[in-house]
Amino acid sequence: MAALVRPARFVVRPLLQVVQAWDLDARRWVRALRRSPVKVVFPSGEVVEQKRAPGKQPRKAPSEASAQEQREKQPLEESASRAPSTWEESGLRYDKAYPGDRRLSSVMTIVKSRPFREKQGKILLEGRRLISDALKAGAVPKMFFFSRLEYLKELPVDKLKGVSLIKVKFEDIKDWSDLVTPQGIMGIFAKPDHVKMTYPKTQLQHSLPLLLICDNLRDPGNLGTILRSAAGAGCSKVLLTKGCVDAWEPKVLRAGMGAHFRMPIINNLEWETVPNYLPPDTRVYVADNCGLYAQAEMSNKASDHGWVCDQRVMKFHKYEEEEDVETGASQDWLPHVEVQSYDSDWTEAPAAVVIGGETYGVSLESLQLAESTGGKRLLIPVVPGVDSLNSAMAASILLFEGKRQLRGRAEDLSRDRSYH
């Protein structure tokens, strides 16, 4: 049997060689058929040149001028091609969320709760514009959640080193987003310290000796709008007393439109410590919510003591006046704050404006501070029968009026110097 197998093996080997040779020749013929001849030479010696089709002309190497024009027409493609190289050279890496990954949900639970936010010292920023403003101001990022890599590449690469980068589905970001149209990127930052922040030079150049003190502001939308107005007017600082909504709440950040990263914001202050944050010789002015006609209807005693005219305070004064008649006791402990129209001059010295909430008004401590610094109540007159102005609107009116007065004083001073 072995003798039969051995000859068969030697017979099969030549057959394989023949098949391989035939297959190689067949492939060569097929490849030759695919080619189009350039010149045909017949046995008679006649030569026929084949003409190329108009659409199959050989490509010409682009000239240097045309290449430059092409680059100018496609700047986005060129910049996009450079971005990955910068990203790769930086050595940044990101993780991709796996099914059932709870990192996003656990972090969102912390940053959306004020007690956890203050305990952990972290805030949530959403959107490329707000995140870019925070990075430029020197805020410290801790973690980014994004749905597309292009969103992350728009941020400064040097600011992303050492930061946890996690790619998640857009649906997951949409579930936790407070925006109507989520932008596909969320950033977790350490709570900014105003001492370590670097604010824009243009903001510092237009800064005025004008401060804002927020007293019992509970509405996030109002506070965010007020901060935006303060940044636009050129306030040098904003102080928030205890009882105000957290300045770093997501709704306040969204309404502020980046104002948090243009000026110092000092949060959660006791009234005893507020004077420590005021420049020397600062006068404190309190915004009054009542109009001239409502002011005239108040009792002389309430008007003299400078209370904001809401029903709660007027009832309190009525009770106090009746008690004075019975006991004959004096109420010298109440602050005496004069009333002044908001458009009269009140910026001859550094000024701080106190804005109270719409529900509770300004506090007794704010009036005491205004009395001790020689400040006044700034009255914004309204038409009889119209309710008090919105806190954000009143703050905008007073702050931009203060800016107008300060600019006018600066122009008068420069004019006097030019004369001399």
Curated annotation (Swiss-Prot):
GO terms for cellular component: mitochondrial matrix; mitochondrion
UniProt feature, compositional bias: Basic and acidic residues: 69-80
Disulphide bond pairs: none
InterPro entries: Alpha/beta_knot_MTases, MRM3-like_sub_bind, Ribosomal_eL30-like_sf, rRNA_Methyltransferase, SpoU_MeTrfase, SpoU_subst-bd, tRNA_m1G_MTases_N
Enzyme Commission number(s) from the entry: 2.1.1.-
Compartments it resides in: Mitochondrion
Binding site for S-adenosyl-L-methionine: G356, I380, L389
Tissue expression per record: Expressed at same level in normal liver and hepatocarcinoma.
Residue span of region Disordered: 49-88
GO MF: identical protein binding; RNA binding; rRNA (guanosine-2'-O-)-methyltransferase activity
UniProt transit peptide range: 1-40
Catalytic activity: guanosine(1370) in 16S rRNA + S-adenosyl-L-methionine = 2'-O-methylguanosine(1370) in 16S rRNA + S-adenosyl-L-homocysteine + H(+)
UniProt key word Iron: no
Pfam families named among the record's database cross-references: MRM3-like_sub_bind, SpoU_methylase
Any GO BP annotation: rRNA 2'-O-methylation
Main location per the UniProt record: mitochondrion
Entry keywords, A to Z: Methyltransferase, Mitochondrion, rRNA processing, S-adenosyl-L-methionine, Transferase, Transit peptide
Keyword Zinc-finger: no
Function: S-adenosyl-L-methionine-dependent 2'-O-ribose methyltransferase that catalyzes the formation of 2'-O-methylguanosine at position 1370 (Gm1370) in the 16S mitochondrial large subunit ribosomal RNA (mtLSU rRNA), a conserved modification in the peptidyl transferase domain of the mtLSU rRNA. Also required for formation of 2'-O-methyluridine at position 1369 (Um1369) mediated by MRM2.
Family under the similarity heading: Belongs to the class IV-like SAM-binding methyltransferase superfamily. RNA methyltransferase TrmH family.
Name used for this protein in its record: rRNA methyltransferase 3, mitochondrial
Organism: Homo sapiens
This protein's encoding gene: MRM3
